[in-house]
Structure formats: structure tokens, C-alpha cells
Amino acid sequence: TSIAEQAKKTAGRRDWDEASYFDELAVRHRDYVPIARRILKWAVERGLDIWWGKGIQDPSFIPVLDFAGIRQQLFGIYLSGVFEVQFQYYKHPPFNHMEYRRELANKLNLISGVSIPEERLTKRPSFSLALLQSEDGLSHVLSTYDWFVNQLKHHATKEGADG
């Protein structure tokens, strides 16, 4: 029965890695491969951990900041061609406060076609990677998340110094 229990737990799951993710993305959304590769490169260059999803239907990769005692997911890039903002998981200062979530949403809303409404600031809103096919859109989302990471690091360092 323990084997049956384990089989139930792992049913509908798969371990993904960079190679398998990008192979499948090329099948599903070939046009999004350069976008996802650039986002991954950006995350790796900043020393972020990469968490590869386990889903079968719509797996993702998620850059994660691990710094000064905080571990924070940034966003998800899904095989369905979606960029997901992960407000629901923003538990660390300053993004545990609505004013900073609002500022992040406002920055992302400057990308043509992106519209994150106020009521989604505690959820996981998403938009199509197609909106990042322009250099302006992709550069803007990456610079916005540079700001995000810098804010997290600044607050973590400040709290460490205050503690």
C-alpha cells in the first residue's frame, strides 16, 4: 500500500529541468523560447535560484531570491506562454505591503497590453509572453524585477541591521 500511496502522490507530476522545459516550450510556443531564455539568463546572472515545476499540464520555472534569511519567489514562466506575477507569495518586506505591490503593478502596467487591476494584488495575475516579444516590453519587465530584487535586498539588509 505504501507503493500505491506514493504512486498517487506522484501521479500527474513530472520533474522538469532546463533542457526538458525548453524542449517542450519549443514544441508548444517556439516564438517564446528566446523570451524565456533571456528571462532565465537574467535570473542566473543575478544569482537567483531556479525552481523547475513539477506539473504535467502547465509546468513553469520560477526565479527565487535567497538572501539574508529570506526566500522569495519572483514570478513564473509557464509552458502555456504565460508570465505570472506571484503577489500571493510576496510575504517579505516591502512587498508584503499593498503600496509596494501597487507600485510593482503600476510598473508592469506600463508594458503595452499588461493590465493588473487592484483586486489582483493578492493573487497571481498573468499576461502572455507575447507582450514581451518587443525589446521594450522584455527590457521593461527585467528592469522592473531588478528594482523588485533591489527593494527586497535593501529591506532585508535594513531589517538585519535594525535587529
At which residue positions do the language-model features occur?
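Well-ordered alpha/beta subsegment
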Residues: 104-162
